[in-house]
Curated annotation (Swiss-Prot):
<feature type="binding site">
    <location>
        <position position="74"/>
    </location>
    <ligand>
        <name>ATP</name>
    </ligand>
</feature>
<dbReference type="InterPro" id="IPR033828">
    <property type="entry name" value="GATase1_CTP_Synthase"/>
</dbReference>
<dbReference type="GO" id="GO:0003883">
    <property type="term" value="F:CTP synthase activity"/>
</dbReference>
<dbReference type="InterPro" id="IPR029062">
    <property type="entry name" value="Class_I_gatase-like"/>
</dbReference>
<feature type="binding site">
    <location>
        <position position="16"/>
    </location>
    <ligand>
        <name>CTP</name>
    </ligand>
</feature>
<keyword id="KW-0436">Ligase</keyword>
<feature type="binding site">
    <location>
        <position position="226"/>
    </location>
    <ligand>
        <name>CTP</name>
    </ligand>
</feature>
<dbReference type="Pfam" id="PF06418">
    <property type="entry name" value="CTP_synth_N"/>
</dbReference>
<feature type="binding site">
    <location>
        <position position="16"/>
    </location>
    <ligand>
        <name>UTP</name>
    </ligand>
</feature>
<feature type="binding site">
    <location>
        <begin position="384"/>
        <end position="387"/>
    </location>
    <ligand>
        <name>L-glutamine</name>
    </ligand>
</feature>
<keyword id="KW-0547">Nucleotide-binding</keyword>
<comment type="similarity">
    <text>Belongs to the CTP synthase family.</text>
</comment>
<keyword id="KW-0665">Pyrimidine biosynthesis</keyword>
<dbReference type="Pfam" id="PF00117">
    <property type="entry name" value="GATase"/>
</dbReference>
<feature type="domain" description="Glutamine amidotransferase type-1">
    <location>
        <begin position="294"/>
        <end position="546"/>
    </location>
</feature>
<feature type="binding site">
    <location>
        <position position="407"/>
    </location>
    <ligand>
        <name>L-glutamine</name>
    </ligand>
</feature>
<comment type="function">
    <text>Catalyzes the ATP-dependent amination of UTP to CTP with either L-glutamine or ammonia as the source of nitrogen. Regulates intracellular CTP levels through interactions with the four ribonucleotide triphosphates.</text>
</comment>
Length: 546
């Protein structure tokens, strides 16, 4: 971080899930539209080292960066809103901070000192914030996870309080997001929760510079004056976060309120006028959609749609590019069997099986894949979805009835899917794993190059000889079965650069049947979409019209 970089800290109060991530990303979008180089960072107060082994039903999606970090789903928002790509430096947790401090204590780096939250933990938090910001960055927006008042967040709040003192008011800004409940029966907006949230923040030494108030409806100047009086925040530094039809409208709403202009003023930034024409085009495209296409997503985490956040957004973005609204029908794979499968898919235009781990609901997914293959329904499989597509093909086309994955059935005699014991990373380093390796941080993670087969549908879609997509898996197609599968009509249309790992499959006789080992949803954005998803949605549109 250079001596001119400005930092905006975004905190939240009253309740969680107010939209701190979207607000932070929207502010970054606005500043980027003014010609500034902006990066973002998310600090998570949980003690896990990363979210890699956490249940998606508790945490939501694990977003994978290009350099292989397993991170919070908010980093997906960041990449969809701004152009800068996130890395492992853009997200860290309490667990990672403590791990680093304890490792240094064991090495003797603290020279016998008693290790304490202050100064050792807070110093490590400050070090990670500052070292994670590149020298060419004009503004860094740092989102603090959790809610003010949570015991887990206190070391992070103390660290940013100290950074305000060390860097000065001209280089730091505190933006606090709170809830303004609207009581419909009384027809009133209640400001008391916001007052108490700001008071709680002041109690630990942080005075909010800007307030963002989440509310069902717009509030008028009388409410602003009341909030300003009791929170010690200037009235012109209080903004509304109102509900919108799509999160991509949020930057435009903030711009209309003069939010970005106020940030430029408060931080004395040398910025040009905002050019939001590209972002306005995105919103116009979303508003102009006509028609609807229904996609069935068959998974086991469907009770929490945040578990598939990037995938949902990739489908929506592809729909916008094709001029239709994508409606996702979430199907719990545990409920699907041979007797009822048709009832789940009779009204859908396409079927998708996403990534996942563990054996729960696997047979329902395989039955769904078989139904898509036999009934010429466009199908997309991702990660585990590709592995199960290979298993289904081996069972029902090759006749290997006990074909399975060694992850899901360790004693299977026909492991068409097996553990990757060795692979080469993009930087040339060789990774090795065994069945006894730790689960956390031991997968094939991050961006890897995939070489596409000439004449394949995948090659036609991507319009390239090779493509880089992000991975998160430890199992792959067993190379001992590849030749037999190809002889039976399955095409491996994408392979790793060393030709050892199967990355893409397709069935040429099918209307549209593609599955990939990677997670292409992580690189889809509302500006640019993603070619694979756009082709898939186009196939779904054509299928629904027939």
């Amino acid at each position: 971080m250079n001596s001119n970089t400005k930092i905006i800290f975004v905190t939240g109060g009253v309740v969680s899930s107010l939209g701190k991530g979207v607000t932070a990303a929207s502010l970054a979008t606005l500043l980027e539209s003014r010609g500034l180089n902006v990066t973002m960072m998310k600090l998570d107060p949980y003690i896990n080292v990363d979210p890699g082994t956490m249940s998606p039903l508790q945490h939501g999606e694990v977003f994978v960066t290009e350099d292989g970090a397993e991170t919070d789903l908010d980093l997906g928002h960041y990449e969809r809103f701004i152009r800068n790509k996130m890395t492992q430096a853009n997200n860290f947790t309490t667990g990672k901070v403590y791990q680093s401090v304890l490792r240094r204590e064991r090495k003797g780096d603290y020279l016998g000192a008693t290790i304490q939250v202050i100064p050792h933990i807070t110093d490590e938090i400050k070090r990670r914030i500052c070292s994670g910001i590149a020298d060419d960055v004009d503004v860094a927006i740092v989102e603090i996870g959790g809610t003010v008042g949570d015991i887990e967040s206190q070391p992070f709040l103390e660290a940013i309080r100290q950074l305000r003192i060390e860097l000065g008011r001209n280089r730091t800004l505190f933006v606090h997001l709170t809830l303004l409940p609207y009581i419909k029966v009384a027809g009133e907006i209640k400001t008391k929760p916001t007052q108490h949230s700001v008071k709680e923040l002041r109690g630990i030494g942080i005075q909010a510079d800007v307030l963002v108030c989440r509310c069902e409806k717009k509030f008028d100047d009388s409410e602003k004056r009341k909030i300003a009086l009791f929170t010690n925040v200037d009235q012109d530094c209080i903004f509304t976060a109102e509900d919108v039809d799509t999160i991509y409208e949020v930057p435009l709403k903030y711009n209309q309120q003069g939010f970005d202009a106020k940030l430029v003023e408060l931080l004395n930034l040398n910025a040009k006028e905002a050019d939001l024409s590209e972002w306005q085009n995105v919103v116009n495209t979303i508003r102009d959609v006509k028609g609807e296409v229904i996609i069935a997503m068959v998974g086991k985490y469907v009770s929490l749609t945040e578990a598939y956040k990037s995938l949902n957004e990739a489908l929506y973005n592809a729909g916008y590019k094709k001029g239709v609204k994508v409606k996702i029908k979430f199907v719990d794979s545990e409920d699907v069997n041979e007797n009822n499968v048709e009832s789940y898919f009779k009204d859908v235009a396409a079927i998708l099986v996403p990534g996942g781990f563990g054996s729960r609901g696997v047979e329902g997914k395989i039955i769904s894949i078989k139904y898509a293959r036999e009934n010429q329904i466009p199908f997309l499989g991702i990660c585990l979805g590709m592995q199960l597509a290979v298993i289904e093909y081996a069972r029902n086309i090759l006749g290997i009835k006990d074909a399975h994955s060694s992850e899901l059935e360790p004693t299977t005699a026909n492991p068409v899917i097996g553990l990757i014991t060795e692979w080469q990373a993009e930087d040339g380093t060789v990774h090795q794993r065994t069945h006894s390796s730790d689960l956390g941080g031991t997968m094939r993670l991050g961006g890897y190059k995939c070489v596409l087969k000439q004449g394949s549908r995948a090659r036609e879609i991507y319009q390239a000889d090779e493509v880089v997509e992000r991975h998160r898996h430890r199992y792959e197609v067993n190379s001992n079965y590849v030749e037999r599968l190809e002889e039976a009509g399955l095409i491996f249309s994408g392979r790793s650069e060393d030709n050892k790992l199967m990355e893409l499959i397709e069935i040429p006789q099918h209307k549209w049947f593609i599955a990939c080992q990677a997670h292409p949803e992580f690189t889809s954005t509302p500006r640019y979409g993603h070619k694979l998803f756009e082709s898939y949605i186009q196939a779904a549109i054509e299928n629904s019209n027939n």
